[in-house]
């Protein structure tokens, strides 16, 4: 069975290689990924289960050039089922042509050798700036 550290390393490697199904296979059937601050830019905060994970990962995999994690740092948690990490991305979003530079912080909880919960924190202004058609202007409500 994989430890949380091994799962996070394998997850980051799979995403960086564009191997969506390999990444999804690391999650428990009811496992998911959560972005607590995505609500601030009107995006769903949680994707749970294989189909929801596919809906999340497909646009990431298909919509960015060179979406590869780098400068990966992994820190032990309270036991082998918990780990935290920091990792960066520097990619280009195809739809907007804008560069996407992001520092993620993540906490992974493993259960029975699978990812039960991955919570990632990131700069949502950078998400909007790089990915939304009009950048951060899309966040401002027009009266």
Ranges and model annotations:
Residues 28-80:
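A solvent-exposed, acidic/Ser-Thr-rich amphipathic alpha-helical stretch
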Residues 11, 23-24, 31, 49, ...:
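Hydrophobic pocket/interface hotspot
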Residues 1-29, 136-143:
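Short, low-complexity N-terminal intrinsically disordered segments enriched in polar/charged residues
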Residues 7, 19, 56-57, 104:
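Hydrophobic alpha-helical segments typical of transmembrane helices
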Residues 3, 58-143:
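A beta-strand edge to alpha-helix "cap/lid" segment located at domain peripheries
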Residues 1, 42-46, 97:
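Alpha-helix initiation/capping motif
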